[in-house]
Amino acid sequence: MNLEFSFGNLIAKNTENSTKEEGTWEVNKLMKFSSEEGRSSSDDYMFSSPDFEKAGNGDAEMREFFNFDGLPDQGLNLPSIAPPSLSHASSPNLSNSQDEAECLPSDRQQDYINPSLHLNRTVFPTPQHSISDANFLANTVDQPLGDNPMFGESDVYLLKMDPMKQAPYEAGFNSVKSSGAIEDPLQFRQPITMLETPFNESINTLTPYAEDYAFSSLNTSAPPLSNKEYAFSVNHLPAINEHKWKSRVETNMLFELRIKSNDNQSVPFEYLRLPSWAHREDKKRSSKPQPLQPDPETVIHLVPTVLAGDKSSVVKTCCTRCLLRERKRNARSQATKDACMPNYTKLKAYERNMTDASPEEKQQFRIKLLNQFPKLEDIDEDRMIMVFTGPEYVRLQLDGNERVAHINARITCYSSHQSCPYFHIIWDLYSMSRLVDRLVFPEPVTVLDDHKSRNLTKSEKTGKSNSQQAPSNHVLSKSNTVPNLVTGFPTRSDNPPNEKRRRTSSSENSRALDIQLSASDSHSPNSKSTLKSVEGSAFSMSKSPSVLSMTTPSGVSPSISKNGFHVVRVPSDAAGFQQRQQQEEGVLEAHTNESAPIAPFPYCTDDFSFSVEEKSSVNNLLTQFDEVAKPDFVSTPIKENVDSSFINMTPPDVSHAPLISRIIPNKGSIMGGYEVTILGANFFNGLVCLFGDNPAAVTFSWSESTIIATCPPATNAGTVPVTFQNYNSSSEAPVMFTYEDNLDNELYKLTVQVLGLKLTGSIQNPLTLSKKLLSSWRDDFAQYITNSIKQPPNSESKGQSKKTLLHDSNMESLKSVISRIVKKDSNQSDDSVESTILAAFALVTDTTTPYLSDFSLVNESGRSLLHLTAACGLSNASTFLCNAGCDVNKRDALGYTPLHYASLYDHKDICVNLLSNGAKPDVIGASGKKPIDLSSSEPIKLVFKEANNEQAQSISRSLIKDSEGSINTNETLESTSIVNEIEESAVQTKSYSESMWNKTVTMFPSLQELPQNYMSEVPSMMQKAMLSTLKSISAIPDDVPPPYSEFADDTTAQAGSSKRDSAISEDPDHHKSVWWSLRWQSRLVGRGKSTALTPEETRAIQEQAKTLKKAGMDFMLFSFWLPALLLLSIFGLRSYAQMIGGYLYRCIIGI
């Protein structure tokens, strides 16, 4: 996009003599400032005119969205910004960054340009001039000079400015200085703003930054460059899959700079020199040699400036996080990685735990991470906000009378890191130290990290670029667009045309429509409207005096069928509309009888809306849309002359039928009970999913396109169609689900888990546990075979003494397993699966471990071993589990008991066995079926009938009958009432005893502590005491090892042997090594437990002993002493009463 456009469409400003407003960028309503949406120069921005900006700045909405802090008042006339400072004391980011909350040290703080410095010094061009108009650029206005106390340290600020840019300003003040207005240039306290520097002035002094431009000498006496001779323009050329005016920090943007002569003469400039502080050589260097010292008069020097989105400050360099990324990218050599990455990885791992650290601590830690990598050598880190790639001197190629240069550049920091939605770019062009032109980019550049976003699809990205290349003809390819089955509107698919997509067997994928959206020009020359986006049923349309019609751009009627349909714009007048309507009537009639449903696209007027008055005429059309997906229509009356016959057309009922496109997973076990996900369209709650003829246990509609169903069990393995109850499948190839018979695998997995629970005490992965058991048993069995071959018969006890009790039990169990399998394999009539399962069950019961056997363990579907053995038809295994105490009425995820599966798979003997062990035949599962309802075998139904009869007979036996055999209701009720009274009296007795105990405990609190303390503490203390007694074991000296150990030799063994040893060795039943082994092992146990009691444990035992002693004393007090005292008191009182009575009697008699 060229910069040669009128400034009246860009900016306007108030001056001292005339009133002008400053134009601002106005964000379109379709614009999204996030990583999920791209930005287009033609679609997403429009530059507002001054008439719309009288109330305030147009960036108010954007500032409110990004929550800017410390911005100037929008009511003020914000000036432009002076060129940025090129000093080295700059910061990597703005200090008010919201994304990082960075608090930088003083040596890396951002130098801001105070917006107040530019008040009353703003000069903007008038609308009739363009940026390439050198005559306008040469016209300047003298600015008021003098001290201003509100600006503070403006002298220091001027000193920090780049002399390359400061020199032209000083040259512009020579006339003022000569008149005596100002004697010292440093007293000027207001920096020069943009677009007001005279371009025809030369620099009179040599700048300190001359080495950056490699000037051998500056020709200060050169004549000034005339601004009317050349015109400069810049254009951003978007690359493939790249949005214009939107980029990433890793992606180079391609810019095209053009220089042309206004008088059609040749341009003398041959090279464009990029800034040396922000330039990096390309990896693939050109083979052509670059000139070392070109003619300075043929070189144009480029100085970039990047402003924040609100134009309140200059962004000089990137933030700390982005600088760390640049350093990491630069440190790609192996030596640098080996030196830097180990420490960086450790610090990065530590940073993840700094969740509660303050922002200052986090920032200091980021700087520490940054210092792990070396600094950039070819780029100045203090001025690297915009980095250029390529040769330092870019050749200006001839293109007729113009010179063209292509420049690759990128912005190294994200917009959000600088607390702004976008950046403004300004390029200053110098020739022979004179400012030739200043190019202000027409639109801001947004730097987003959208390549990590999962919401923005590739098709949306390519759709944006396609809309830019052909804004008047938006075309959606066949492979990239599919219809929305709910609303009838075309929607973009998630995959681009060239991307591999996973195909399904659904019908709608095989009937993908070719949808082409094209836009024709409107009658108004200034009216330009494009279809922004069509996403699902929610869409939006820009304002345009046109309507939508279903026709082709060439006027040929469309084919509204499975082949696709086309949508273009037609005039909104009634005559043009009726003419096109007549062309379409014949086509609509011709396609009425076709099998594919018609998905009508609504006609609408200018604002793509319907009025309230005409709402009744479009009720049939609006019924196609779900209420959640309805767009918000704006009330606009429809023209009366428009024929609404097509609008009132009612779609067929088949369009509302639920459609299934895919099922995940599409296969599973015949036992069912697991959840599957069904994808499609038009789903709602209340649907019943059918797997063949069996309804799903649970069908829950998660959304209009997703259903979660619980797969029902099946009698046989195979493929069944998946449909909905009361809805016929409209597709030729319905979605299929495959049942697999993998009951053996499920049974093996659960059996291995039960075995692992017995051996290890924890539930583990069956595959991992089986590998461990096989490896352990293989090694143990090989060792057992080796020992049995090598050892003589009389040394068997010696070999066994090396094994522990658990090891011996495992060996015995392994031998029993081997013997069982061998015996079962010898009989060909037995089932190998059942024999293996029974051998595993025997291994669980025979193995001696500290852990208990648990045959009631369940898998993820809630099924136990009894469920699986009943389904597999293993009658002996089922009998074993019933005898082992498994719950015969255990329910799984479907609510089925083992009796359900035995009835489903027609295993009569297992049904009889379960019923005899207390299985209930009337249990109802999740599908509302009893075990008898699942069976198709008449013998099994007879078994259930007999069981029901026996249950009825057992119930009838409990009823009291009279002599005639009829039920005596009165006596039965009386017996029942007696039983109830007995139960109630038992409950009352229990509650009374509990209340008495509570009262006793309240009176004597020590009685409550006695049972609890004694029962909980005595066993542990007894164990401690038993372990402590092992310290007193001293069967043999510590320095005498057993004779078979590696520490013993013949002399030690002979010296350590005693008379008792020789006596035992003569006995053939007691081997010498066995006796030594027992003595040594006992001694080892004593040594190992010599420190069993720690001081803390000793103190705890003493405290518990005191508690027990006190509880015992209290018990003796309350159980013996208090009753004895009570009896003595009674006898004493009785004796005292008798004595008093006798005394009184004698007194009375004596009187």
Swiss-Prot record:
Gene Ontology cellular-component terms listed: cytoplasmic side of endoplasmic reticulum membrane; fungal-type vacuole; nucleus; vacuolar membrane
Compartments, as annotated in UniProt: Vacuole membrane
Skewed-composition ranges (Polar residues): 87-98, 464-496, 517-532
Gene Ontology biological process terms from the UniProt entry: positive regulation of lipid metabolic process; positive regulation of transcription by RNA polymerase II; regulation of transcription by RNA polymerase II
Keyword annotations from UniProtKB, A to Z: ANK repeat, Membrane, Repeat, Transmembrane, Transmembrane helix, Vacuole
Recorded GO MF terms: double-stranded DNA binding; transcription coactivator activity; transcription coregulator activity
Pfam family name, one: Ank_2
Topology relative to the membrane: Single-pass membrane protein
Per-repeat ranges for ANK: 861-890, 894-923
Region named Disordered: 77-104, 452-511, 516-535, 1041-1067
Residue intervals of the IPT/TIG domain: 658-739
Segments crossing the lipid bilayer: 1113-1133
Compositionally biased residues, Basic and acidic residues: 452-463, 1058-1067
PANTHER family registered for this protein in UniProt: CALMODULIN-BINDING TRANSCRIPTION ACTIVATOR CAMTA (PTHR23335), CALMODULIN-BINDING TRANSCRIPTION ACTIVATOR, ISOFORM F (PTHR23335:SF1)
Official protein name in the record: Ankyrin and IPT/TIG repeat-containing protein C26H5.05
Naturally occurring in which organism (per UniProt): Schizosaccharomyces pombe (strain 972 / ATCC 24843) (Fission yeast)
